[in-house]
Amino acid sequence: NLFGNNSYVYYYQSAFRPPNGWHLHGGAYEVVNVSTESSNAGTTECTAGAIYWSKNFSAASVAMTAPQNGMLWSTAQFCTAHCNFTDFVVFVTHCYKSASGSCPLTGLIPQYHIRISAMKNSSLFYNLTVAVTKYPRFKSLQCVNNMTSVYLNGDLVFTSNETKDVSAAGVHFKAGGPITYKVMREVKALAYFVNGTAQDVILCDGSPTGLLACQYNTGNFSDGFYPFTNSSLVKEKFIVYRESSVNTTLDVTNFTFSNVSNATPNTGGVHTIQLYQTSTAQSGYYNFNFSFLSSFIYKESDYMYGSYHPSCKFRLETINNGLXFNPLSVSLGYGPIQGGCKQSVFENRATCCYAYSYNGPPLCKGVYRGELTKSFECGLLVFVTKTDGSRIQTRNEPFTLTQHNYNNITLDRCVEYNIYGRVGQGFITNVTNYAINYNYLADGGMAILDTSGAIDIFVVQGEYGLNYYKVNPCEDVNQQFVVSGGKLVGILTSRNETGSQPLENQFYIKIINGTRRSRR
């Protein structure tokens, strides 16, 4: 039934006429996701004869249903519905318009008729024109991967020899909605046939009823116990940590600079300023030690004179205050305070330049044309080459990260675990109520191991005290379904699951709705 959001549909080929009885067969599609849409035509009407609206999927089947009364084949309500199988598109539309630009995909369609078409690489390769007397209103379009089948109002209107998942689908409409999109997964089904017609269907969907029926290949059971196996698909993983928090101290690389006492003056121009103690940061945390600058005098920027660092909003004394960079390189040089910094930045020797005076001799040559042979006061020039980013960060002290660990333990299903460093698969149950009165895990122990070395019982400190958990095998070889009065009423298992009741040396889990699925 396409109109039930928690429902399923079952298709079988008309040539499939098995003998009377139960038969395991493909062709069932179960709803796994539902969404609705009220309208997607922004103008006074939708555009017929064209595909204007689509939603992306990756599904075995997608069903698009209108309200049960259906929608009129009119641009005031419904225009086009389509199924996209990646390589080609199947769509149903109408278009009784002759104006220029109308019906771009189909051309004029006769009045009171609809068109079912298939298109590949912008070329139509299938066309079927049907009178609306057969389909008075649009009610549903379902796209199915098996043989790329398309069903209009429940009738098969297109199929091919390919099987492909649905990649997109949509309904373009103005009113009469909402349209409900149902994404479906393919499951096997056990169907009961009478005279070649399916009368009853049980989905092999992992539910208790599906497990029982599809394993025994029948839907009719007398009262009794029925052993069964169920291979669990592990989808979840959790970690139980030894410590509630872990502190990690990150290394800080230190670059310490010092005065160069035997530095030679430049001989004219910035390219003759020799570089010393070049230090380049790659990534991580860094500290730049310029303590020797305390005996130098910082020179502010004054036109050609002094420092020049408009691209660096910091002084060297504050470079360690958590600043972030991508590449960062620092060098020392000795050159003229007059023009040495500004011209070095202009000629791309550095991004920024900081000038310091130490009352040096006037032995440095000029850096500008016409001043290359003139002598100026020598000073200390600190060159910084950088771009902003996040790979490098400066720090005044080592940096400590604190990681807080939270133990979110997944119960009552097969999971992958990492418990205090031991890994494996298991079915975890809470046994605190059974272990609280016994001397489990004495002397501060955290886990009890079985003979194979795997974890059997482990303890976790909870908000209100210690909690004990048992690791069971994912597959219970002793589990049995219980049938009473022809209905599935419970499960006998050797595992103490949440909500189970002790029954001698086993546990009983009651099934509230154990009746088999019936055809809707």
Curated annotation (Swiss-Prot):
One of its GO terms (biological process) is endocytosis involved in viral entry into host cell. GO terms for cellular component: host cell endoplasmic reticulum-Golgi intermediate compartment membrane; membrane; viral envelope; virion membrane. Glycans are attached at residues 5, 33, 56, 84, 121, 127, 146, 161, 195, 220, 230, 247, 254, 259, 289, 408, 430, 496, 513. Pfam families: CoV_S1_C. Residues 1-520 are extracellular. Keywords: Cleavage on pair of basic residues, Fusion of virus membrane with host endosomal membrane, Fusion of virus membrane with host membrane, Glycoprotein, Host membrane, Host-virus interaction, Membrane, Viral attachment to host cell, Viral envelope protein, Viral penetration into host cytoplasm, Virion, Virulence, Virus endocytosis by host, Virus entry into host cell. Specific enzymatic cleavages in vivo yield mature proteins. The precursor is processed into S1 and S2 by host cell furin or furin-like protease to yield the mature S1 and S2 proteins. The cleavage site between S1 and S2 requires the optimal sequence [KR]-X-[KR]-R. Cleavage is not necessary for virus-cell fusion. It comes from the Viruses. The keyword Membrane applies. InterPro entries: CoV_S1_C. Homotrimer; each monomer consists of a S1 and a S2 subunit. The resulting peplomers protrude from the virus surface as spikes. S1 attaches the virion to the cell membrane by interacting with cell receptors, initiating the infection. Belongs to the coronaviruses spike protein family. This is Spike glycoprotein.
